[in-house]
């Protein structure tokens, strides 16, 4: 492995706060309440002051012919890049204007996202136009967001210019090439006071069931949801790191770069294509981190199926998954995928409790529920006919009409959930099928540019509530 490491220098300050303590984010009743002034940018600044020489993000580049090349950035170096890129953004975009990231997976994407937030603009995490099969989604998101500026890299600039060239001149944004911005640009950066209720970024929905829409995710929602995940998955050990190949424009991928900001650790990133071509790369990266402490990763159901089938390692491979926690979600979870993965990798130290079936939606920033840390994945079976009648009736696994459903655990702390009849808006009793309604500080502010849909989805109130038992 060719390792490229840049060395930064941390500068401590006695009047600056230390690393965030999770207990400082809980009130007297144990509810998640962000302390004043806490947001992604202030957390990054804490890390710069306290662990500036520590690695913040590592990217495993598999595009070269000589094997994997690891590129790292420390917290101090990241801070330098954020000021420089932020200054470049401030020259072309004002506070509250949208800045779209159209860049390939990598550290420049990470820096671009955080720089847009630091500059006081609204980040719009998208992807380079060269990504195949997503042209319509990009065009829809771009038309909705109407960004003032675009962040990209030198390698993707050609495809970005081609894409922007097809837009009407009145809609063509300024372009900032992130990896060509000199560090010295940071001298021109103007600090911005971040309002916790302001929009941090627009998270576009997947578009799997409807055209993609941009969820307005506030700074409070981001911070709250990260704390909720840390508490639910029991990631309280500071010696916890992340590994992810998920696209950074995906809400689950974006969360994987948020974790390190909270606890001062680091995340190791891969490109989605690197995983798809050789899924064992994911396992190898997890194993490397597992040797040094706890490691958390997240992926959709198909990834576990794909890795169990195509990510097999030779018996002599030195792989240790003892300290790995794996979130599975983002699409319907199947017990067959979990079982296949467990059978393949439990001999490598994977705990029976390691895989955490979870549920989340972009409207809730990401995370809604997961199973308890000490609980293995479980499945229940419902009667197919009864489900069509909006009734959840348990049956035996061998019942001819049995429909398996993997349990996604408990609702996160300081998030409230009820099941509602969508027609009457009345809360339903146990055993009923209805809409999931959520409430909490992690819920987004609305859909960007869609006031009617926002009123329908984000301001609805139940017409009647069940009596608490």
Q: PLM features: what roles do these ranges have?
A:
Residues 324, 333-469:
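Conserved AMP-binding/adenylate-forming
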